[in-house]
Structures are given as C-alpha cells and as structure tokens.
C-alpha cells in the first residue's frame, strides 16, 4: 500500500474548487444508494456551502488537497477522501487529528455506506443512535456514532 507523505492544514479560499471536486468524486465512489434527483439536490446544497467552509485538509507534497474534514465543535460533520487516495491513511490522519482535540468526538454516517461504518468502527467509534431519515428528511438512514476511547 502506497503511503505518500501527507500533511494537514486549514483550508483557504483558493481551496474551494478542489474540495468540492473531492466531495463529488468521493460521493460518486461511495454513495451509489442516492437517487439521481437527491444526488443533484445535495450537490447544489454542498456547492453553496463547502467552498467557504472552515475545513481541515490533508494535502500531498505539492500542497494539493486529497481529503478534508469539517469539525463543528465536538461533532465531525464531514470526512471525504479523494478516491485515488483512499486506503493510504488520509482519513485516519484527519480523524486522529480531530480526536486529539475532541475526546468523545461524534459523527454521523449513512447506514448504506458499509465502508465508512467499518472505518469508524475500526477507529473506536460505536453506534449511539439511528435516524430513519437524513438531516434533510430524505429516506437515507443515518447511524449516529461516538468515539469511545
């Protein structure tokens, strides 16, 4: 497994297009359960918000974003990794960064995203609840997770 040297930094305004593309590519690779209409609607919502959101980025040696995380207090609202960099420790690096700052970190994951559920469980997250609908009332069940050291 290739583990290229990645570092972390806070996002800056010029990162907007790159993080939006990471989100789109990651969703295309992992969220095949979304209907086409919902995928389009969610894309529009994310495109309005994500480029200016205060993110933590994982960047490669050329300072190109390869993944990002959005923290909101003690909750991780988002974690997305460019498909070409999955399995290289990028997501783990971002989550460990958050856990070092926020013991008991919580996050939510789509129930249908088995890969993400397994990833979080391997890092010590446990289910603490479930919602039948996502945050926008769409029929995509959410598992609520909390890190238990």
PLM region descriptions:
Residues 1-14:
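Conserved N-terminal entry element of GNAT/NAT acetyltransferase domains
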Residues 16, 20-50:
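Conserved GNAT-fold acetyl-CoA-binding loop/helix
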Residues 45-57, 75, 138:
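A short helix-loop-beta-strand connector motif used in the catalytic cores of GNAT acetyltransferases and
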Residues 54-67:
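Conserved beta-hairpin
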Residues 75-86, 110:
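A short, internal acetyl-CoA/4′-phosphopantetheine-binding micro-motif in the GNAT/acyltransferase core
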Residues 87-100, 118, 122:
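Conserved acetyl-CoA-binding loop-helix of GNAT-fold acetyltransferases
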Residues 101-112:
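Conserved GNAT acetyl-CoA-binding A-motif
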Residues 121-130:
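Conserved acetyl-CoA-binding loop of GNAT-fold acetyltransferases
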């Amino acid at each position: 497994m290739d583990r290229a040297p990645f570092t972390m930094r806070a996002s800056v305004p010029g990162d907007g297009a790159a993080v939006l593309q990471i989100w789109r590519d990651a969703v295309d690779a992992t969220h095949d359960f979304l209907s086409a209409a919902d995928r389009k609607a969610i894309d529009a919502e994310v495109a309005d918000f994500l480029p200016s959101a205060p993110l933590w980025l994982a960047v490669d040696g050329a300072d190109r974003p390869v993944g990002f995380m959005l923290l909101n207090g003690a909750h991780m609202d988002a974690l997305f990794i460019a498909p070409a960099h999955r399995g290289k420790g990028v997501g783990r690096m971002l989550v460990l960064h958050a856990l070092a700052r926020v013991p008991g970190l919580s996050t939510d994951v789509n129930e249908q995203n088995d890969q993400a559920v397994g990833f979080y469980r391997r890092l010590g997250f446990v289910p603490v609840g479930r919602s039948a609908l996502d945050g926008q009332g769409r029929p995509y069940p959410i598992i609520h997770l909390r890190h238990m050291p």
